[in-house]
Design a protein with these regions (language model features):
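Active-site-proximal alpha-helical scaffolds that flank and shape metal-associated catalytic sites
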Residues: 76-155
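Non-cleavable N-terminal signal-anchor transmembrane helices
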Residues: 1-16, 103, 112-117
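Short, well-ordered alpha-helical segments
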Residues: 70-76
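Flexible, glycine- and charge-enriched loops at secondary-structure boundaries
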Residues: 5, 71, 95
Length: 155
């Protein structure tokens, strides 16, 4: 193998080992553990979709009239990621966002989607994102994580 690749693998090995030893893995020992994990992790999936949209708004042109903005390479990278995340494919070859696919997987395994669906419903009803997050039945750590993303995105 390429010596550069070997050096790169060696340099990230300590971080990789730290990640692999993360306590979350000990919590996922059975279906119930996976269900509990996904009921919280779905907010990280939604957060990523929102952060990605913030990057697309900030680094590409999404306004009318369209004008070129920033680096073409940056636009390509961001839009390629957006395409993949917003236009995934399910097991029936139907287009679906990665977020919606995650929700579908949660439902198939019997995990509750009540809290994330309630949050999305509040947003669809016009409640500002910070208020919708605050009103959600979520642990404080999850609320803080989400609020941090939107504080960055809006400021």
């Amino acid at each position: 193998m390429n010596s550069h690749v070997e050096q790169l693998k060696a340099s990230i090995e300590p971080v990789r080992n730290t990640l692999l030893a993360h306590p979350v893995y000990s919590q996922i020992q059975d279906l119930q553990g996976l269900q509990r994990f996904s009921e919280t992790h779905v907010f990280a999936v939604w957060d990523f979709m929102s952060l990605l949209k913030s990057l697309q708004i900030g680094l590409t042109s999404v306004a009318l009239p369209w004008v070129p903005v920033g680096s073409a390479d940056t636009r390509y990278l961001i839009n390629e990621i957006v395409l993949g995340e917003e236009s995934d494919v399910d097991e029936f070859d139907v287009r679906i966002s990665h977020f919606e696919l995650y929700i579908k997987a949660m439902q198939q395994m019997g995990a509750s989607t009540t809290v994330i669906e309630a949050l999305i419903a509040k947003l669809n009803a016009g409640l500002p994102v910070q208020e919708a997050i605050e009103a959600a039945a979520l642990p404080k750590k999850v609320k803080d994580f989400l609020q941090f993303t939107f504080d960055i995105s809006f400021n």
